[in-house]
Amino acid sequence: MTAQELFDLTIDDIVDRIQNSHGLTKFAHRRAKFEGWLKVEIIDILAKKGKNALPEIGRIDVSFDTVGIELKTVNTNIRYPNVINTTRPITKNIDGVNEDIDNLINTEFADKFIIFVAFPITHDNQNWKYHLGRITENLENYLHRQFNFSGNIPGVIYCGKIATDRH
């Protein structure tokens, strides 16, 4: 499976669910993570499309067929209207994404992916580009889609295929 195929299979549906969830807007407003919700929703989307998606096989968040997917939510410390200003350890969040990539690389899955939601942020934010680069250097390729939670809080969802020939 390619990153484009997984992106096409999941991202429109998950973005619709994010944008229509008043509960997630509360999370975004407080910069709170929602990985458990994301896991349930991704499995629901895949199951409705005929995939036998399961949670926590070999400690991997979501898997089906030969595909393993790790999920993360990355709450940033960048100031935005409608979002509480708090200190968030973005470096630790990025390290957590890369740890999940490292865990997945050592599995038997043929196709290994990371899907992560970053918020509040826009894809072209200069501060974010540095942090994103620390993740994407571990990816063969990736796609993204920018969206807004209700309340005009910006977020970006990324879907990347993990490079198997990393140094």
Q: What does each model-found stretch correspond to?
A:
Residues 85-114, 124-127:
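Short, charged, amphipathic alpha-helix that recurs within catalytic cores of restriction-modification
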Residues 48-70:
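Hydrophobic/aromatic-rich structural module bridging two neighboring secondary-structure elements via a short loop
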Residues 1-56:
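Acidic-basic catalytic patches of nuclease active cores, encompassing PD-(D/E)XK
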Residues 113-167:
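Domain-level recognition of nuclease-like catalytic cores that cleave nucleotide substrates
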Residues 21-29, 108-124:
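Short glycine-rich, basic-tinged beta-strand/loop micro-motifs
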Residues 62-87, 104:
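Conserved catalytic cores of phosphodiester-cleaving nucleases, focusing on short active-site segments
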Residues 25-31, 78-93:
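Surface-exposed cleft-lining segments at the edges of enzyme active sites
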Residues 10, 14, 18, 42, ...:
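Hydrophobic, Leu/Ile/Phe/Ala-enriched alpha-helical segments that form helix-helix packing faces
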